[in-house]
Amino acid sequence: MTVRNGGFPGDYNRNSFDSPGGCDDSPNASKDDETFGVPRIVLPLSDLSSSERRKWIHTLRQELEQLRSFQKSVGDLLPISKIVTSTPASNVSRPKSFGMSRCSTGPGKRVLPFTATKPEPVTTSTMLRMKQCESLLKRLMSQQHCWLFNTPVDVVKLNIPDYFTIIKHPMDLGTVKSKLTSGTYSSPSEFSADVRLTFRNAMTYNPSDNNVYRFADTLSKFFEVRWKTIEKKSSGTKSEPSNLATLAHKDIAIPEPVAKKRKMNAVKRNSLLEPAKRVMTDEDRVKLGRDLGSLTEFPVQIINFLRDHSSKEERSGDDEIEIDINDLSHDALFQLRDLFDEFLRENQKKDSNGEPCVLELLHGSGPGNSLTQHCDGSELEDEDVDIGNYEHPISHISTVRTEKDSVGGLNQMEDASRGKLSLIEGADGHQDGNSAPKEKELPPEKRYRAALLKNRFADIILKAQEITLNQNEKRDPETLQREKEELELQKKKEKARLQAEAKEAEEARRKAEAQEAKRKLELEREAARQALLEMEKSVEINENTRFLKDLELLKTVNTDQLRNLRDVGSESDGLAVFGFGGSNPLEQLGLFMKHEEDEDESDMLAFPDPGNEVEEGEID
């Protein structure tokens, strides 16, 4: 039996070896060299009596119970520190000052103090980073192909005997998780080194064209991207060692109850002062990504937020931003969720401004025959078509879902088909009566669309009637056959009538289009005509009328006026060149006025005397 004597709290075993059998004076007890300042005593069990054995068993049990209680108290104070399982007393790490070893080891033996290594101080930032490492490892192990790296490599099962020859330091994520849980890692850098070693071993042993190599490369990039985020957060924060770490450096030899209570209150006070940070779960993160992906157009607030939280390498262009939602911190994710919820609330307010349109089916009453929707007037002009007098748009009628395996589904189809049949029958009834003027007022495009909608729903109605007939199995087969034949005949007539209406509507639409084209052509011609009339004149056609007015003036002027003008006017006037004298200037130019009484003399002038021939232009 080997017994280590160390100075436990309170020196409760100071005289534990002073047994009646004389532990210190026993000639059979051999004392070995001291290890770590603790004397070691070897007791042969064969030389001990039964009473001495019982005494030793009782003493060792008491020491073991006290050791366990001490270990539990240290574990409560240091939750992140190394937790040592129940092993022999030689493997228990003790604080610095446990007191002096007081065991009497015989005459001439010197007493050595118990010296222990100083534990590394644990800071608040280190505790937070270790928690982040644990969450990152969980996310990494939940990836698609990560199961290949969760367990150690089995060289026998995989038939790779040379694995340990190539890989000197094997590692897997399962081992990393066990080390992280047991508190083996003293810093996050050790954790990241083991994770990188796992993927590096896989990429070293397997060729680059192997799937395991590609999976390891992908998971390594996944880890590195998220590890950089943790490093960025922890690099700027420097916190002093917490009170939990400083407690390990103090003497814990039988602490007084009052002091212990004071320390626990200080720890609780510090924990209350720290603000609780919100953490977004993986499900909420995936839901947020789906909600953002469903947006056809991102609002300005979300675009600015993503641009602020994205690095320059992630921006492929001015208008395109690529960002991984898993890279964002929890605070950023909650801010993004708040922006998205605010955007949805604004859209709901805009949609609620539209007035509700109640759509009721004809010949029916009850909640199943009306549909309430929020719509704007502009949408009704483009999409909705009125059929008949007081009919509502058929495009808002929900389609019938056929459920072959359930009776409730057939009943719903029958009710819906009856409602649609009453709608179309009401339309046909109104067309023959008072609704004829109303239908003529509709544009050809809407009438054509109404005919198409009627033709489309006719098959659904007739099929629903066939299903209704097939359900009545208890009725007379002859009656059912006759009703089916009548239904087929009605179906043919209905199709023929609807096709004729569609043709008429198409013809009316074509005529309306031709009239519209003709009207546009007339408008274009009229516009061209007005443009020609408004054009500026480039040539004056009546420019020579001024000369005629001047000649008229010369004709009517008398001799005195002409003489006065001649005396007063200058040579530049142009009148001096004419030697008119006192005669008519027109006659001077050879121009004569022909009067009616001179018509008789024209015959005499036609044959003049050859001897007295007058030159042309001469006045007699």
UniProtKB/Swiss-Prot annotation:
Q: Which UniProt keywords apply?
A: Activator, Bromodomain, Coiled coil, Nucleus, Phosphoprotein, Transcription, Transcription regulation
Record region (Transcription activation domain): 445-620
Q: Which positions carry Phosphoserine?
A: S417
Q: What SMART domains does the annotation carry? A: BROMO (SM00297)
**Which parts pass through the membrane?**
none
Q: Which residues form the Bromo domain?
A: 124-230
Q: In the UniProt record, which is one GO cellular component term?
A: nucleus
Identify the domain of life.
Eukaryota
Q: What is this protein called?
A: Transcription factor GTE11
- The organism encoding this protein is Arabidopsis thaliana
What gene is this protein translated from? GTE11
